Amino acid sequence: MKGRTSNSTGIKDWADIDWKVVNTQVSKLLHRIFRATRNARIGSGSWKKVRSLMKLLQRSFSVLLSAIQKVTQKNKGKNTAGIDGFIAIDRQQRSKLMNSWNWTEALPTRRVYIPKRNGKKRSLGIPAIKDRIGQAIMKMAYEPVFEISFETQSYGFRPGRSCHDAIEDIFQTLKQGSTYKWVLDADIKAAFDNISHDFILKKIEGLPGRNVIRKWLKAGYVEEWKHYYDTESGSPQGGIISPLLSNIAVLWSTRTAFRL
Protein backbone atom coordinates (compact mmCIF):
# COMPACT_ATOMS: atom_id res chain seq x y z
CA MET A 1 0.00 0.00 0.00
CA LYS A 2 1.46 3.32 -1.07
CA GLY A 3 0.57 6.99 -1.24
CA ARG A 4 -1.15 9.55 0.89
CA THR A 5 -4.61 9.57 2.37
CA SER A 6 -6.64 12.20 0.55
CA ASN A 7 -7.89 15.13 2.64
CA SER A 8 -11.07 16.42 1.03
CA THR A 9 -12.27 18.20 4.18
CA GLY A 10 -10.13 21.30 3.91
CA ILE A 11 -9.04 20.86 7.54
CA LYS A 12 -5.40 21.82 8.06
CA ASP A 13 -5.18 22.37 11.81
CA TRP A 14 -5.74 19.73 14.49
CA ALA A 15 -7.78 22.21 16.54
CA ASP A 16 -10.37 22.55 13.75
CA ILE A 17 -11.43 18.89 13.72
CA ASP A 18 -15.09 18.15 14.45
CA TRP A 19 -14.72 14.89 16.36
CA LYS A 20 -18.43 14.16 16.37
CA VAL A 21 -18.38 14.04 12.57
CA VAL A 22 -15.16 12.00 12.51
CA ASN A 23 -16.42 9.42 15.01
CA THR A 24 -19.73 9.07 13.16
CA GLN A 25 -18.01 8.47 9.83
CA VAL A 26 -15.61 5.91 11.33
CA SER A 27 -18.44 4.10 13.10
CA LYS A 28 -20.46 3.88 9.88
CA LEU A 29 -17.51 2.40 8.00
CA LEU A 30 -16.89 -0.19 10.70
CA HIS A 31 -20.54 -1.25 10.70
CA ARG A 32 -20.57 -1.47 6.89
CA ILE A 33 -17.58 -3.82 6.95
CA PHE A 34 -19.13 -5.92 9.70
CA ARG A 35 -22.45 -6.24 7.84
CA ALA A 36 -20.72 -7.02 4.53
CA THR A 37 -18.63 -9.71 6.23
CA ARG A 38 -21.69 -11.26 7.87
CA ASN A 39 -23.53 -11.31 4.55
CA ALA A 40 -20.54 -12.81 2.74
CA ARG A 41 -20.28 -15.58 5.33
CA ILE A 42 -23.93 -16.61 4.92
CA GLY A 43 -23.85 -16.37 1.14
CA SER A 44 -26.01 -13.28 0.66
CA GLY A 45 -23.09 -10.98 -0.08
CA SER A 46 -19.65 -11.01 -1.69
CA TRP A 47 -16.13 -10.93 -0.29
CA LYS A 48 -15.32 -8.48 -3.06
CA LYS A 49 -17.52 -5.92 -1.30
CA VAL A 50 -15.76 -6.64 2.02
CA ARG A 51 -12.36 -6.01 0.43
CA SER A 52 -13.66 -2.85 -1.26
CA LEU A 53 -14.94 -1.46 2.05
CA MET A 54 -11.67 -2.33 3.79
CA LYS A 55 -9.78 -0.35 1.15
CA LEU A 56 -12.21 2.54 1.58
CA LEU A 57 -11.55 2.56 5.33
CA GLN A 58 -7.78 2.38 4.86
CA ARG A 59 -7.91 5.51 2.68
CA SER A 60 -10.42 7.41 4.83
CA PHE A 61 -9.21 10.74 6.22
CA SER A 62 -11.58 10.40 9.19
CA VAL A 63 -10.06 7.02 10.01
CA LEU A 64 -6.58 8.57 9.80
CA LEU A 65 -7.61 11.30 12.24
CA SER A 66 -9.08 8.72 14.62
CA ALA A 67 -5.88 6.65 14.43
CA ILE A 68 -3.66 9.68 15.14
CA GLN A 69 -5.85 10.61 18.10
CA LYS A 70 -5.65 7.09 19.56
CA VAL A 71 -1.89 6.84 19.15
CA THR A 72 -0.88 10.35 20.23
CA GLN A 73 -3.55 11.22 22.81
CA LYS A 74 -5.43 8.19 24.14
CA ASN A 75 -2.96 5.30 24.31
CA LYS A 76 -0.83 4.83 27.41
CA GLY A 77 2.35 4.77 25.32
CA LYS A 78 1.68 8.11 23.65
CA ASN A 79 4.78 9.67 25.20
CA THR A 80 7.07 6.75 24.37
CA ALA A 81 9.13 7.06 21.20
CA GLY A 82 10.00 4.32 18.77
CA ILE A 83 13.35 3.87 17.03
CA ASP A 84 13.08 7.27 15.29
CA GLY A 85 12.79 9.12 18.62
CA PHE A 86 9.64 10.98 17.50
CA ILE A 87 6.48 11.59 19.51
CA ALA A 88 3.58 13.93 18.70
CA ILE A 89 2.76 15.71 21.93
CA ASP A 90 1.24 18.97 20.70
CA ARG A 91 -1.27 20.33 18.21
CA GLN A 92 1.36 21.41 15.67
CA GLN A 93 2.94 17.95 15.51
CA ARG A 94 -0.44 16.24 15.13
CA SER A 95 -1.40 18.73 12.41
CA LYS A 96 1.82 17.88 10.59
CA LEU A 97 1.10 14.16 10.88
CA MET A 98 -2.40 14.46 9.41
CA ASN A 99 -1.24 16.72 6.56
CA SER A 100 1.84 14.71 5.57
CA TRP A 101 0.64 11.16 6.28
CA ASN A 102 1.63 8.46 3.82
CA TRP A 103 2.23 4.71 3.97
CA THR A 104 5.99 4.46 4.44
CA GLU A 105 8.32 1.49 4.87
CA ALA A 106 8.08 -0.16 8.28
CA LEU A 107 10.79 0.72 10.80
CA PRO A 108 12.23 -1.81 13.27
CA THR A 109 10.63 -1.71 16.70
CA ARG A 110 12.56 -0.51 19.73
CA ARG A 111 12.79 -3.40 22.18
CA VAL A 112 12.83 -2.75 25.92
CA TYR A 113 12.44 -5.14 28.85
CA ILE A 114 9.80 -4.64 31.54
CA PRO A 115 10.16 -6.25 35.01
CA LYS A 116 7.50 -8.84 35.92
CA ARG A 117 6.17 -9.66 39.39
CA ASN A 118 8.07 -12.95 39.46
CA GLY A 119 11.38 -11.17 38.98
CA LYS A 120 11.69 -12.04 35.32
CA LYS A 121 11.38 -9.61 32.44
CA ARG A 122 9.12 -9.48 29.41
CA SER A 123 10.05 -7.91 26.12
CA LEU A 124 8.10 -4.97 24.77
CA GLY A 125 8.44 -3.87 21.16
CA ILE A 126 7.74 -0.18 20.59
CA PRO A 127 6.93 0.74 16.97
CA ALA A 128 7.58 4.20 15.58
CA ILE A 129 4.65 6.62 15.79
CA LYS A 130 3.88 6.40 12.05
CA ASP A 131 3.85 2.61 12.22
CA ARG A 132 1.53 2.76 15.23
CA ILE A 133 -0.84 5.00 13.30
CA GLY A 134 -0.76 2.61 10.36
CA GLN A 135 -1.41 -0.33 12.67
CA ALA A 136 -4.37 1.48 14.24
CA ILE A 137 -5.83 1.97 10.76
CA MET A 138 -5.28 -1.68 9.81
CA LYS A 139 -6.76 -2.84 13.11
CA MET A 140 -9.93 -0.88 12.35
CA ALA A 141 -10.08 -2.45 8.88
CA TYR A 142 -9.46 -6.04 9.99
CA GLU A 143 -11.25 -6.20 13.35
CA PRO A 144 -14.85 -6.20 12.04
CA VAL A 145 -13.90 -8.91 9.53
CA PHE A 146 -12.56 -11.29 12.18
CA GLU A 147 -14.72 -10.34 15.17
CA ILE A 148 -17.62 -12.20 13.59
CA SER A 149 -15.50 -15.40 13.58
CA PHE A 150 -14.22 -15.27 17.15
CA GLU A 151 -15.72 -17.57 19.75
CA THR A 152 -18.46 -16.16 21.98
CA GLN A 153 -16.47 -17.26 25.03
CA SER A 154 -13.32 -15.42 23.92
CA TYR A 155 -12.70 -12.23 25.91
CA GLY A 156 -9.03 -11.28 25.62
CA PHE A 157 -8.08 -8.14 23.69
CA ARG A 158 -11.54 -7.71 22.20
CA PRO A 159 -13.60 -4.49 21.94
CA GLY A 160 -16.33 -4.15 24.53
CA ARG A 161 -15.13 -7.17 26.53
CA SER A 162 -13.16 -7.49 29.76
CA CYS A 163 -11.89 -9.99 32.31
CA HIS A 164 -15.03 -9.29 34.36
CA ASP A 165 -17.15 -10.57 31.47
CA ALA A 166 -15.04 -13.74 31.37
CA ILE A 167 -15.49 -14.26 35.13
CA GLU A 168 -19.25 -13.82 34.81
CA ASP A 169 -19.37 -16.30 31.91
CA ILE A 170 -17.45 -18.90 33.95
CA PHE A 171 -19.74 -18.36 36.95
CA GLN A 172 -22.90 -18.76 34.87
CA THR A 173 -21.54 -21.90 33.21
CA LEU A 174 -20.51 -23.55 36.48
CA LYS A 175 -23.82 -22.93 38.24
CA GLN A 176 -25.90 -24.49 35.46
CA GLY A 177 -26.98 -28.10 36.00
CA SER A 178 -25.72 -30.60 38.53
CA THR A 179 -23.03 -32.37 36.51
CA TYR A 180 -19.33 -31.94 37.14
CA LYS A 181 -17.53 -29.49 34.91
CA TRP A 182 -13.89 -29.22 33.98
CA VAL A 183 -11.88 -26.01 34.17
CA LEU A 184 -8.61 -25.80 32.24
CA ASP A 185 -6.17 -23.24 33.63
CA ALA A 186 -3.51 -22.85 30.95
CA ASP A 187 -1.09 -20.24 29.71
CA ILE A 188 0.25 -19.79 26.19
CA LYS A 189 3.94 -19.23 26.81
CA ALA A 190 5.29 -16.08 25.13
CA ALA A 191 2.18 -15.93 22.95
CA PHE A 192 3.12 -12.76 21.10
CA ASP A 193 6.72 -13.87 20.54
CA ASN A 194 5.75 -17.22 19.01
CA ILE A 195 3.09 -16.24 16.48
CA SER A 196 3.91 -17.84 13.13
CA HIS A 197 4.23 -15.22 10.41
CA ASP A 198 3.36 -17.73 7.70
CA PHE A 199 0.25 -18.83 9.60
CA ILE A 200 -1.04 -15.28 10.09
CA LEU A 201 -0.27 -14.22 6.53
CA LYS A 202 -2.10 -17.27 5.21
CA LYS A 203 -5.19 -16.42 7.28
CA ILE A 204 -5.32 -12.85 5.92
CA GLU A 205 -4.42 -13.80 2.35
CA GLY A 206 -6.36 -11.83 -0.23
CA LEU A 207 -7.27 -9.02 2.15
CA PRO A 208 -6.11 -5.45 1.43
CA GLY A 209 -3.15 -4.32 3.51
CA ARG A 210 -1.71 -7.83 3.94
CA ASN A 211 1.65 -6.75 2.51
CA VAL A 212 1.84 -3.84 4.97
CA ILE A 213 1.21 -6.22 7.88
CA ARG A 214 3.91 -8.52 6.51
CA LYS A 215 6.40 -5.63 6.54
CA TRP A 216 5.59 -4.87 10.19
CA LEU A 217 6.07 -8.51 11.15
CA LYS A 218 9.39 -8.71 9.30
CA ALA A 219 10.72 -5.26 10.31
CA GLY A 220 13.00 -6.62 13.05
CA TYR A 221 13.87 -4.86 16.27
CA VAL A 222 16.67 -2.81 17.82
CA GLU A 223 18.03 -3.14 21.36
CA GLU A 224 19.88 -0.36 23.18
CA TRP A 225 19.34 1.88 20.14
CA LYS A 226 22.11 0.12 18.18
CA HIS A 227 21.85 -3.69 17.91
CA TYR A 228 19.53 -4.85 15.11
CA TYR A 229 17.89 -8.29 15.01
CA ASP A 230 15.67 -9.94 12.40
CA THR A 231 12.22 -11.21 13.35
CA GLU A 232 11.36 -14.65 12.00
CA SER A 233 8.30 -15.11 14.21
CA GLY A 234 6.14 -13.18 16.63
CA SER A 235 4.42 -9.82 16.71
CA PRO A 236 5.78 -7.22 19.14
CA GLN A 237 3.95 -6.89 22.44
CA GLY A 238 3.47 -3.18 22.17
CA GLY A 239 2.27 -3.15 18.60
CA ILE A 240 -1.33 -1.94 18.25
CA ILE A 241 -2.28 -4.69 15.82
CA SER A 242 -0.53 -7.49 17.76
CA PRO A 243 -3.49 -8.41 20.04
CA LEU A 244 -5.74 -8.86 17.00
CA LEU A 245 -3.14 -11.02 15.23
CA SER A 246 -2.77 -13.05 18.42
CA ASN A 247 -6.53 -13.63 18.58
CA ILE A 248 -6.56 -14.74 14.94
CA ALA A 249 -3.81 -17.27 15.70
CA VAL A 250 -5.55 -18.47 18.88
CA LEU A 251 -8.88 -18.87 17.07
CA TRP A 252 -7.63 -21.43 14.57
CA SER A 253 -5.20 -23.06 16.98
CA THR A 254 -7.94 -23.81 19.52
CA ARG A 255 -10.34 -24.95 16.83
CA THR A 256 -7.72 -27.42 15.64
CA ALA A 257 -6.81 -28.55 19.16
CA PHE A 258 -10.41 -29.09 20.28
CA ARG A 259 -11.80 -29.92 16.81
CA LEU A 260 -14.42 -27.19 17.03
Task: Tell me the role of every PLM-derived stretch.
Residues 75-87, 107-133, 149-162, 184-185, ...:
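Short, conserved non-catalytic motifs in the polymerase core
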Residues 12-77, 140-156:
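Charged boundary/loop elements
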